[in-house]
Amino acid sequence: MAEERIRIGIVGGGRISDLQCLGYLEHPGAEIAAVCDVDLVLAQRRAHEWGARSAYASLDELLADPDIDAVDILTPHHLHASQAIAALEAGKHVSLQKPPVLSLAEWDAVTAAARRSGRTLRVFENFMYYPPHQKAKELIAQGAIGEPISVRVKTAAGHPSAGWTVAPSSQAWRMDPSRCGGGPTTFDHGYHCF
């Protein structure tokens, strides 16, 4: 008997979904079943690229789909709490891109919804799996480099020099503290550092 696969609904078809969806596409126990984006044409294109059966422009439509077991929320930060709560209340498991919310009050509301629903809630932090970070952790554990007392990191993100281009129009919300929670340095890229 074939093992049942978890059916994922991707919420947000922006640039980060290119990276996030690789794991689902490569995992035999997962299937991208639907894509939701406010831009229906983008949702349809992504659905075609990833072999999803459905594309939606409305989160409510995706959450009403009985063939979706879990959602991966890849939207701007200010939308995370309301979308996660709606998904949990609809009986879906939820994966949230970092940062999960903009405030402790939002986090309390999301975790309360997860407890009430009995569904799984996870926050995805991809940097902990990056090979350089894994190697540094290994070297520290082995005592090979002594005890770190400070770390200096130079990064470039969303720019061609970093090997990953993000359109300026897709970056605009990251400059608005009410939508991103504190600016790109603190709440977007900075989140990885903690």
Spans of model-derived segments:
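Short, conserved SAM-binding/catalytic segment
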Residues: 46-52, 113-117
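Beta-strand-loop-alpha-helix segment that lines the small-molecule cofactor/substrate pocket
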Residues: 2, 70-128, 143
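Alpha-helical elements of Rossmann-like donor-binding domains used by nucleotide-donor carbohydrate transfer enzymes
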Residues: 19, 45, 61, 70, ...
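N-terminal Rossmann-like dinucleotide-binding module
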Residues: 1-50
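Conserved SAM-binding strand-loop segment of SAM-dependent methyltransferases
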Residues: 52-59
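Conserved acidic residues
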Residues: 33, 53, 67-69
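Nucleotide donor/acceptor-binding cores
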Residues: 4-6, 119, 149
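Predominantly a Rossmann-like dinucleotide-binding segment in NAD(P)-dependent oxidoreductases
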Residues: 127-194
